Amino acid sequence: RKGFTAFLGTMSGLFVTASLTFIFGDIFRIDGMSQPFAQSVIFSSAMRLDILKIFYAAIVIGASGAAMDIAMDMSATIEELKYHNPALNGKELIKSGFNVGRSVIGTMTTTLLLAYSGGFLTLLILFLERDMTLLQILNMKMITSEIIKIIIGSIGLVVVAPMTTYIGAIIYSLDDEKVRKINSNFQLKRIINMILK
């Protein structure tokens, strides 16, 4: 149950992240060329690459690790709550899960912010040394791309905790027979084998 709940919670967050990536990318007219080595890849490769889609994939992949971490934390929390107090109903599990989720989301979004901004610290120092205004810095495509990564990644993480809590509350409120039926119908291993063929 724990792994299944975490999987569904992670996928819901990544779906939101991917959707927002396309929306924000279109609004801000991002072309993907702000990525490190993007020009080198285009000019040195014989393949026809869509740099914009690679940029979108980088955003989703960048957020996926933290999303999995939050989803597993929330799933484990719901499991422990139900294990120690089997009388808890779905509503009580959701309330307790949300209380834990607030703490988890705060630290994870900060981690994501620091991970993205840490890589561009020397670049920001260079901008400040050249006496560039904040407006000039924000209008640079490279900076805009990083801001979009941070915003989209954070929104995706904020979605993961409540979605995992809702999913976990539903799954852990079901009796064992219903869970076995869901697992047999889902057949995750069969789906993965079909994809890998």
Where are these regions (language model features)?
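Transmembrane alpha-helical segments that form the functional core of multipass membrane systems
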Residues: 1-42, 49-62
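Juxtamembrane loop-helix boundary motifs flanking transmembrane segments in multi-pass membrane proteins
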Residues: 3, 52-55, 85-97, 135, ...
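Pore-lining and gate-forming transmembrane alpha-helices of multi-pass membrane transport proteins
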Residues: 9-14, 44-61, 107, 137, ...
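Transmembrane alpha-helical segments of multi-pass membrane transport proteins and ion-pumping complexes
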Residues: 14, 18, 22, 26, ...
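Juxtamembrane inter-helical linkers in multi-pass membrane proteins
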Residues: 35-45, 80-96, 153, 182
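Oxyanion-binding "anion nests"
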Residues: 53-79
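Helical hairpin unit composed of two closely spaced alpha helices linked by a short loop
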Residues: 69, 80-123
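Hydrophobic alpha-helical transmembrane segments of membrane transport and translocation systems
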Residues: 117, 123-197
